[in-house]
């Protein structure tokens, strides 16, 4: 077996196009246990995601997690699945299409760290189209080793297989980007104008294990910085918003406060009207549509809440597309 992938039948002068790759986490191909299992396996065997020795983690993963979780996750996916497919895939594809329309001189594609469209397939297609330069934008405003780091790893794995390697730039983070903050501000204000406004705004980010933070992962700090900038843009006082972290799994300690815990505590503290927005998610997905919009509502009402509004992610919001164009232009530099 050859150590490198075959190169496209293009001369070196034909491999001078510039491509932009929007890279998101991933999704199963269908809302079924059969489709969820391989997706979970690829996700949960990544050492960036679960930092445990294989001898300890793999028996748990194969003996329990991959036996029990696929059916449960498939049921959750069924609740939020679109006719066109997974919401995460649909919205990320729309973002890429909108960016391509605004930057017609570039090749713009999207891929998933886990699942389809795979990084391997998309990079192969980009090379065949003559892309010699690649700007990778992991769709995570706040850097975490388990998300942004894992995404860049996938690209680097493919570079190791290329005989004629592409020139690559990556956008590691944009948690304080003015366009991103303004897009969220405008999006939330429009939502409030149309649907009304609760007494408190919860800004819920995906969680990470506390150990990751203790070992130097900047993610929680960047999340809190984003929340502060967004709150200032919305002219909120400190008692009008709260920052939390969701989607914990396993027995390890995770960064706090927990979104799920706050759903139970806030009504008892007199907060019965709550709006929830997830700044770290640029496209709606299982963690926002099922965990927050559906399950979060149930948890909040069961604890005594009276009004609950989930504010959708930016998705293909025009203001966000404007910000994404500006972000790409800034990082492309002399490549355009």
Swiss-Prot record:
Gene3D superfamilies in the cross-refs: 3.40.50.1400
Keywords: Cytoplasm, Heme biosynthesis, Iron, Lyase, Metal-binding, Porphyrin biosynthesis
Catalytically driven reaction(s): heme b + 2 H(+) = protoporphyrin IX + Fe(2+)
UniProt protein name: Ferrochelatase
EC number: 4.98.1.1
Enzyme class: lyase
Binding site for Fe cation: 206, 287
Coiled coil: none
GO cellular component: cytoplasm
Gene name of the encoded protein: hemH
Metabolic or biological pathway, per its Swiss-Prot or TrEMBL entry: Porphyrin-containing compound metabolism; protoheme biosynthesis; protoheme from protoporphyrin-IX: step 1/1
Keyword Ligase: no
GO-annotated biological processes: heme biosynthetic process
Disulfide-linked positions: none
GO MF, any single term: metal ion binding
């Amino acid at each position: 077996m050859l150590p490198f992938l075959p190169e496209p039948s293009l001369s070196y002068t034909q491999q001078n196009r510039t491509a932009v790759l929007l890279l998101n986490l991933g999704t199963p191909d269908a809302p079924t246990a059969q489709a969820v299992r391989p997706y979970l396996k690829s996700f949960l065997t990544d050492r960036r995601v679960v930092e445990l020795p294989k001898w300890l983690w793999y028996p748990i993963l194969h003996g329990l997690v991959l036996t029990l979780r696929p059916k449960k996750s498939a049921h959750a996916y069924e609740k939020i699945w679109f006719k066109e497919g997974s919401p995460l895939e649909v919205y990320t594809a729309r973002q890429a299409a909108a960016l391509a329309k605004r930057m017609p001189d570039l090749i713009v594609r999207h891929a998933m760290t886990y699942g389809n469209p795979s990084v391997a397939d998309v990079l192969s297609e980009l090379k065949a189209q003559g892309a010699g330069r690649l700007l990778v934008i992991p769709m995570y405003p706040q850097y975490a080793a388990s998300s942004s780091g894992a995404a860049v790893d996938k690209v680097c794995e493919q570079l190791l297989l290329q005989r004629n390697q592409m020139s690559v730039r990556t956008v590691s983070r944009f948690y304080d980007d003015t366009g991103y903050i303004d897009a969220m501000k405008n999006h939330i204000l429009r939502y409030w104008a149309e649907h009304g406004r609760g007494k408190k705004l919860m800004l819920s980010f995906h969680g990470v294990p506390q150990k990751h933070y203790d070992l130097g992962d900047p993610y929680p700090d960047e999340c809190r910085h984003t929340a502060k900038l967004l709150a200032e843009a919305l002219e909120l006082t400190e008692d009008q918003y709260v920052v939390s972290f969701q989607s914990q799994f396993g027995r390890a300690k995770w960064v706090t406060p927990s979104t799920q815990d706050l759903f139970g505590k806030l009504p008892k503290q007199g907060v019965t009207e709550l709006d929830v927005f997830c700044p770290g998610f640029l496209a709606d997905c299982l963690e926002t549509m099922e965990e927050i919009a559906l399950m979060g509502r149930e948890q909040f009402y069961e604890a005594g809440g009276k009004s609950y509004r989930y504010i959708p992610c930016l998705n293909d919001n025009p203001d966000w597309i404007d910000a994404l164009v500006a972000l790409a232009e800034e990082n492309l530099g002399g490549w355009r």
